[in-house]
From Swiss-Prot:
This is DNA double-strand break repair helicase HerA. It catalyses: Couples ATP hydrolysis with the unwinding of duplex DNA at the replication fork by translocating in the 5'-3' direction. This creates two antiparallel DNA single strands (ssDNA). The leading ssDNA polymer is the template for DNA polymerase III holoenzyme which synthesizes a continuous strand; ATP + H2O = ADP + phosphate + H(+); Couples ATP hydrolysis with the unwinding of duplex DNA by translocating in the 3'-5' direction. InterPro entries: DSB_Repair_Helicase_HerA, HerA-like, HerA_barrel_dom, HerA_C, HerA_central, P-loop_NTPase. Homohexamer. Interacts with NurA.
Amino acid sequence: MEEFVGIVRGEASFTSYEFSINPSANVSFGEFVVTKNRDGDLVLGTVRHVKNVNWLLSSVKSNFNSLALDIEEYGESLGENEEVVATVRILGKIEGNELVPNRVPIRNGEYVYKASDDLLQMIYGNDGIEIGTLLLRPNVRIKLDVNELVSRHFAVLAVTGAGKSNAVAVIIKGIVEDVGGTVVVLDPHGDYVNLRLPETGIDLVNIIDGKIRIEDLDPEELADLIGISSSAQIQRHFLSLAWETVKHKNQSLGGESLLEALLDLLNEWISRKTIKYWSEKEGRMKSEDLKSERIETIRGIIFRIRRFLRNYGNIVTSENLVAAIKPGMVNVIDLSPLDENQMKVVVGKFLEAVFEKRVEYEMARKRFEKETSKKKRDEYEEIMTEIESKYPALAYPILVIVEEAHIFAPQGEENDAMRIMGRIAREGRKFGVGLGVVSQRPSKLNEDILSQMNTKIILRIVNPRDQDYVLKASEQLSKDLMDDIAGLGKGEAVIVGQAIKLPALVRIYNFKELRGKAGTGQYGGEDIGILDRWNKMKRNMVNSLDIDIDF
């Protein structure tokens, strides 16, 4: 047994108990302790409350004056009547290296001991990727089950500056360097473009510019991309006619060339005052007169397209973004040059393509294994071979981490990015597509998606609305654990869910202190050093004005 810390007293059940703390012991909030139930089985629990009681001063009728008189009267004997009492929440009964539900109450008078580091390590396990240590036990390493983390999805939630990006970087390191998995990070702010892994440096980091194949967009997606309001239905109608016509007549074009062809067609409509367009339904070209009041409508579309090309022409590509993903690496999609609406379009198309290719590959693989007909087996093998050739990373499971997930899947809003994220959350485990969502405002994140993130890494959250929202969306998160979250320090987290054997308060490793063959880990996302910047500006200004000031 470890250190003897107290004796069970008062009301005790199969879910909780109190114990009087040994005066020579040091017992903190969150400490792990063990005792025996009435059947003699070892029971593990955590200290949830610690209170100090003095029986000589505990009268409810006491006021300041009477307390002062009592202190003077009792003198040194006060200390002899003082007691520190701890309340314990029972986590379970220990069976081998597992915890099972405890269904037998604790007997008064049982001795309570601190749980040993070895016992805790055995329970938390030694398999998986290492993310940190128990907050109160730095020798107990916390590992996350990779299968559960990826296939059942996860969320990293916290206020700004609490350590979200650091936690994500530690997870990436574990999956890419330790396991050899493939990770994609959708990065709205460019926080990971300078990512450097401890063991391999930048060798396993693939930076991909967030661009989009214009030819893959439908009319509504194109309207969103170039900034036509969803309420501008007439503009969207004419854009739809023109877009379908241009794509039909110029099937070999892509990228900016296709947009230039679209501009040519719109200008032709204005100059001829006639709309000639392709009707997919009838399978032929049709024409109608362009009413004079609609000329300005079309000019508005032209203005939007030209402005888009001027400001964002560099995000248009004819290359396939999904084909750029490299297996066994962290692939950072840099979305920072885009505005939020454009990000949603790019992310929606990208995730849809990733998911569809994974579904196609896994369905072909399963049918190939079951099929007895050589002809059918050859067909399925051809599908797999084509994907392995064009999209080598998608022949294997993949994890997609969505930073600032509330941008792409906001509560109460419909968009393509949110719909495909929801589908991955529901069906991704069947096809080897894992989803990780990261957010500083969980209450703004789609509740259905958040609830399907079956492991939650929750750093400091102080907003009551965010706390209530996370609690509502988390079956594994108890109210008392939620109470811990507001008091967490930077880099400290509550981890609950299927990737960890039981909930834990964890000190997550500092990624920038993880040392390997390539040095220490690095990533962006730090706050700007405002004071240093201002001091530098002041020095430059003082020097230019030749003023004598001490710094």
